[in-house]
């Protein structure tokens, strides 16, 4: 979810889904070590429960990332072993680490030694020609022996040579049964399925076989899908239909005095907001002109279907 689930996006999604676990964009351990880690890790308290997803293969740097993430109050530290991009591979992390399970296990142990916050792993079902249940099971067993008890499994193999990251999200076939088998064989572990979930009916079916589902692209293509899940089954939880009053959107886009407007904008709200309401975050005049009593319908119209 690079370039999508930053803290502004997560705040917005939390308005729609009070109960979902939210995940950050992948933040590299090297960036946390060398960069302005406070700017990378800060988040609003309303985002809880929220997980920090870290990328890396150096146990010492990953341990530092876990320690700093825990200090900032994250509810979970997740290791990305699923991203197939060339850039990530060149840094020796992401999906390519499925071929080096002991390295991932070393990171799990080092991170757990630094914090009591749960350390989890997000992975694929395989990579390239290593596309068998036995390969996935062995990888998970090694991480479990290191102490990891929660796995988020994207039910596609990652093709590291020949497919782009975008193609890797759709071209390899979904193999849900492989994830279901993992849960049957390791019932003591928490297994979350990811990949291709676009309907409430799919969620119901998948939850008969695993402990949870992770929603990725569907959450930014149709954020209100999360609100539908919150209210399913009917009566479980209610989300206010006018949750996105203009006065709630203004803080998301308000430019801090020392922060460029581009940092706040990017593309987070574009799929669901009216272009007339926030014209590409072009300046304060548009935002200050918003009056909740006059603009509420503009906010609600794209969302209430």
Question: Residue locations for each model-derived region?
Answer:
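Flavin-dependent oxidoreductase catalytic cores
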Residues: 1-241, 245, 250, 257, ...
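Ser/Thr/Pro/Gly-rich low-complexity, intrinsically disordered segments
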Residues: 259-261, 274-277, 290, 294
């Amino acid at each position: 979810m690079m370039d999508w689930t930053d803290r502004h996006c997560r705040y917005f999604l939390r308005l729609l889904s009070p109960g979902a676990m939210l995940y950050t964009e992948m933040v590299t351990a090297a960036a946390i070590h060398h960069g302005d880690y406070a700017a990378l890790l800060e988040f609003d308290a309303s985002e809880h429960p929220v997980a920090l997803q870290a990328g890396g293969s150096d146990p010492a740097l990953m341990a530092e990332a876990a320690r700093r993430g825990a200090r900032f109050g994250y509810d979970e530290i997740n290791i990305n072993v699923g991203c197939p991009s060339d850039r990530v591979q060149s840094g020796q992390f992401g999906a390519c680490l499925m071929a080096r399970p002991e390295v991932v296990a070393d990171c799990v142990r080092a991170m757990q030694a630094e914090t009591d916050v749960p350390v989890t792993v997000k992975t694929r079902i395989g990579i390239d020609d290593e596309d068998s249940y036995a390969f996935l099971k062995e990888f998970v067993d090694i991480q479990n022996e290191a102490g990891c008890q929660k796995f988020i499994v994207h039910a596609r193999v990652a093709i590291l040579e020949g497919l782009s990251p975008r193609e890797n999200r759709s071209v390899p076939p979904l193999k849900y049964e492989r994830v279901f088998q993992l849960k049957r064989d390791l019932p003591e572990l928490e297994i979350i399925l990811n990949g291709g979930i676009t309907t409430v009916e799919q969620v119901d079916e998948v939850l008969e076989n695993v402990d949870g589902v992770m929603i990725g692209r569907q959450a930014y293509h149709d954020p209100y899908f999360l609100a539908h899940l919150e209210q399913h089954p009917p009566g479980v939880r209610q989300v206010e239909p006018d949750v996105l009053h203009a006065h709630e959107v203004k803080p998301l886009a308000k430019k801090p005095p020392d922060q460029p407007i581009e940092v706040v904008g990017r593309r987070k709200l574009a799929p669901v907001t009216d272009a007339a309401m926030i014209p590409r975050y072009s300046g304060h005049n548009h935002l200050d002109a918003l009056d909740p009593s006059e603009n509420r319908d503009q906010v609600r119209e794209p969302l209430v279907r």
